[in-house]
Amino acid sequence: MGYTLPVFATAAAVAALRCLTEGACPQQVTLALLRPNRCETLPIAQGACLDAQQALAITYSEPSDALDLTRYTPIWAWVRWQDPVTAPKIQIEGGFGVGRDRATGKAAIYRYARLLLTTNLLLYCPKERAIAVTIVLPQGRDLAERTSNAAFGIVEGLSLLGTTGIAQPLTAPEQLDRYREDLAEKAAQSSTLVFCIGENGLQVAQQLQIPPSRCVKTANWLGPMLVAAAHYEVQQLLLLGYHGKLIKLAAGIFHTHHHLADARQEILTAFCALAGLDLEMLHQVWQAPTVEAALKFLERMVPHVLPEILSHIAHRIDQRATAYIHAHCAAPIGRSLQVGCALFGRDRQIVATSGAGNIILREISIR
């Protein structure tokens, strides 16, 4: 079992506060996770008082998923006394490596993380005192480059998000089983469904007013979920996801975790070549630091060609998904299943829809 980033940030913050109140850093701290309603004890790597007014403590992330990119990343918490007359009791800030919301400028420290920090720090903060807490992720900016955070408005680092303290391993068979169970229940009610790739997919489905009863959340196991949809006799299936994730399917990659396969740059370059872009532009796409940067470059340089490229990618996703189902299901299972896709961009607006995707979207809106 592992924990989410907010839990480790809270452990470091509590340890730093106890440095100030007790004069020494504890080797471990016990936290109330809130969700679930239980306490857990976590180790503290290092900690010390910097002076009488401030302290620093460090933990290391230990999520349950061995492929989680935050595994073993250090989390620092810098805690200092504040004037209790003018300052809030507990002030929480994001330091280096903690992302910020591009739209608001606020640190990407969300509700559960703030509640977890506040609840546990109040247990150790003297009644007459106030503290400021800054969470620092020294590797946060580098790690964020390997995520799609920037595409969804979170820049300069990682988010402290989640709704629970327990990390759900992305590769756990039991989690895939839960997705399959949800798929089975919804397939029994409707033959036209939407695979929403991650939380962003669910949000876009809501924007499109797709009924929740038609939406099935998926993570990285698109291959097994496609096969399951065929076995549950789904007739129409829309893949709704961020283009930087679904593009992998165009190359036949059906487990999309970045640690297992991250050929997005190569795939995009190949489709640019098929669209007839010259060698210099292909080099620019190939050498872009991220796929998002490459797409921005194309948007700027060849805005008239980019829709064609994305349309070809969407069409190829349909082809490869259909071929995957046929390869993994004995006939006649899945032969009548129509797969389409809709890709959205960083602004959560649809940027490309395959022909089958358009048909399925119309079907859903009619019903």
Curated annotation (Swiss-Prot):
PANTHER family: COBALT-PRECORRIN-5B C(1)-METHYLTRANSFERASE
Keywords: Cobalamin biosynthesis, Methyltransferase, S-adenosyl-L-methionine, Transferase
NCBIfam families: cbiD
EC number annotated for this UniProt entry: 2.1.1.195
Enzyme class: transferase
Protein name: Cobalt-precorrin-5B C(1)-methyltransferase
Family membership noted in the UniProt record: Belongs to the CbiD family.
GO molecular function, one term: cobalt-precorrin-5B C1-methyltransferase activity
Gene Ontology biological process: anaerobic cobalamin biosynthetic process; methylation
Top-rank taxon: Bacteria
Metabolic or biological pathway: Cofactor biosynthesis; adenosylcobalamin biosynthesis; cob(II)yrinate a,c-diamide from sirohydrochlorin (anaerobic route): step 6/10
Pfam families: CbiD
Reaction(s) the record says it catalyses: Co-precorrin-5B + S-adenosyl-L-methionine = Co-precorrin-6A + S-adenosyl-L-homocysteine
Gene this protein is translated from: cbiD
Stored InterPro entries: CbiD, CbiD_sf
